Amino acid sequence: PYTPSTPSTPSAPGLDKTKTDSAAAINAAATANKYDAAEQAEVKKILDKANADIKNAKTEAEVKAIEEAAQAEIDKILTTEEKAIVAALDNVEKRDFETKSKVITRKGGKKVIRLTWTAPDGVDVDGYEIFRSTKKNSGFGKKPYFTTSNTSYTNTKDLKAGKTYYYKVRAFVVINGERVYTDYSMKAFRTIK
């Protein structure tokens, strides 16, 4: 009599290819940056764990998740050059990064507040965040009032006669997609009369 055979589970060529591709992608990401010996040791730990996890993965989705997690961890490791940038930002002090302000009367009598500052020494910044408040020591909020790549800003909106406006500025550099900030500048303030 005919006995149907139990179908064998075929090996998943798609999964094998995904494993190979993911391992290659992680290794490529690790060698793309210029890491020193200590940083390379950190990267090697991540790679060894990821490669072991990929071998044991059961699905393509699992492999992709391992690859993405490993790449994210590798991206967090700062190179010597990036560490130097962070150190330079940390060394920018308020007195080195002063914000000046003045009230300007435009044609038609409208008054605006013009802010200017000097780029911090030793740092190639990507931009500046300006914070504004009507209180001297609070009310600046966590979100910047304005962001610019220039070393000046003219506040033309939401200005009322008799009010004093306080401003502080901080510079930032983008490293691995994240903003790293200097300390805030000394506050500048002006009263609209």
Where are these regions (language model features)?
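Beta-rich interaction/scaffold domains
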Residues: 1-88
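Ser/Thr- and Asn-enriched, surface-exposed coil loops between beta-strands
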Residues: 59, 107-111, 147-153
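Pro/Thr/Ser/Gly-rich low-complexity, intrinsically disordered linker/stalk tracts
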Residues: 84-122, 179-193
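An aromatic-rich alpha-helical recognition segment common to small helix-rich domains
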Residues: 117, 130, 155, 167-169
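Solvent-exposed strand-loop boundary residues in beta-sheet-rich modules
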Residues: 121, 134-138, 175-177
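Solvent-exposed loop segments of extracellular immunoglobulin-like
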Residues: 124-126
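Recognizes extended acidic, P/S/T-rich segments that occur
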Residues: 129-161
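Beta-strand-rich modules
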Residues: 158-176
